[in-house]
């Protein structure tokens, strides 16, 4: 979630200043101001000399392409995540709740921020304890041929799809209940080359596992693509499925729909994931006959997040965003008797797993 990392850090600092309703300056900040004033005095005593311009060739050599910037930022984030995220925890959350009956299906969705990394942090043990019927993974960043069967939880079939660009995006599914069919992508090459969608067909419904494009890792450079191309084509794909049978659309949808879906909405109006364009697009889709299932059961609940920046202890302070969802066809809501849940104590990624239990009758 690279586009929000620096922004969330600034939000955290602002929140910490205002938690008690005051605007007082910390001793550390006072010291920094004093140091800056001292430096200003020193600079005035130094004779100013014009800065030398770098040779054109040297400047050009330093210039990086947009793709190189994104690659470098994603690599830095993954390295930092590996350092700062703990091993997958299974001791705090009661993974036996909610209870799942024979005629029900338990579905878990989790942005793992790198499957290779989470495998080394206790992923298999978590899955064995959680015991989902279907596990949908996003941001797997792995070549399926590099996954070894003996690393995977027993009793599951698994299917992964990678992006054309190595080490980016990607999705995967693990299933105990074998689907009737599996589809990779949505049938449009310009979208499918990023490995963002896997669809499972069951008798009662489709499960659509998705890692929605981020509107921009540096600024909002992909916002137009996200709204005018991806959302248009992907939502048409969902509508086509829904005409046949209900859908369960899950994954990292990269949007905080309303102001209670992130800690600090006022300073994030122009941040990827909370722009009016992204939120409006999501609202318009829901109005066509779909339900944000978590909000259905928890309409006014604040502080329910699924993503936290690893910078500045965002998770421990609960400075986060709700970016992960189970969106379902309205006609399927009678099959969901209890609220979807967030496994906020399960570590290993900057996202937590989310889950839902669906009746199969």
UniProtKB/Swiss-Prot annotation:
Disulfides per UniProt: none
Compartments, record wording: Nucleus
EC number: 3.1.-.-
Organism of origin: Dictyostelium discoideum
Descriptive protein name: DNA-(apurinic or apyrimidinic site) endonuclease
Cofactor(s) annotated in UniProt: Mg(2+); Mn(2+)
Keyword Hydrolase: yes
Residue stretches of biased makeup (Acidic residues): 25-39, 68-80
Biased composition (Basic residues): 43-64
Keywords associated with the record: DNA damage, DNA repair, Hydrolase, Magnesium, Metal-binding, Nucleus
GO cellular component: nucleus
Cofactor note: Probably binds two magnesium or manganese ions per subunit.
GO molecular function: DNA binding; DNA endonuclease activity, producing 3'-phosphomonoesters; DNA-(apurinic or apyrimidinic site) endonuclease activity; double-stranded DNA 3'-5' DNA exonuclease activity; metal ion binding; phosphoric diester hydrolase activity
């Amino acid at each position: 979630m690279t586009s929000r990392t620096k922004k969330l850090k600034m939000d955290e600092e602002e929140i910490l200043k205002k938690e008690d309703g005051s605007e007082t300056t910390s001793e550390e900040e006072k010291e920094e101001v004093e140091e800056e004033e001292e430096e200003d005095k020193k600079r005035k005593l130094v004779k100013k000399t014009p800065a030398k311009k770098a040779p054109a060739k040297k400047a050009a050599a330093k210039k990086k392409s947009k793709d190189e910037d994104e690659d470098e930022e994603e690599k830095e984030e993954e390295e930092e995540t590996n350092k700062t995220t703990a091993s997958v925890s299974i001791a705090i959350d009661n993974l036996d709740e909610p209870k799942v009956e024979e005629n029900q299906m338990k579905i878990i969705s989790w942005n793992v921020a790198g499957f290779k990394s989470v495998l080394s942090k206790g992923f298999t043990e978590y899955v064995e304890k959680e015991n989902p019927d279907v596990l949908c993974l996003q941001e797997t960043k792995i070549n399926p041929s590099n996954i070894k069967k003996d690393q995977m939880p027993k009793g599951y079939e698994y299917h992964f799809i990678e992006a054309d660009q190595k080490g980016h995006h990607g999705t995967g599914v693990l299933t105990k209940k074998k689907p009737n069919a599996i589809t990779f992508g949505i049938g449009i090459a310009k979208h499918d080359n990023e490995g963002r969608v896997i669809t499972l067909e069951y008798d009662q419904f489709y499960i659509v596992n998705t890692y929605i494009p981020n509107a921009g890792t540096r600024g909002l450079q992909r916002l137009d693509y996200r709204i005018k191309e991806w959302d248009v084509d992907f939502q048409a794909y969902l509508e086509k499925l829904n005409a046949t049978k209900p859908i369960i659309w899950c994954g990292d949808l990269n949007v905080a729909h309303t102001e209670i879906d992130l800690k600090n909405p006022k300073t994030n109006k122009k941040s990827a994931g909370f722009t009016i364009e992204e939120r409006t697009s999501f609202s318009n889709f829901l109005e066509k006959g779909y339900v944000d299932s978590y909000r259905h059961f928890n309409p006014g609940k604040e502080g329910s997040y699924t993503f936290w920046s690893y910078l500045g202890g965002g998770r421990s302070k609960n400075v986060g965003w709700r970016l992960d969802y189970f969106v379902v066809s309205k006609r399927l809501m009678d099959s969901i008797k209890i609220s979807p849940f967030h496994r906020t104590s399960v570590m290993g990624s900057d996202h937590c797993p989310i889950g839902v239990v669906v009746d199969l009758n």
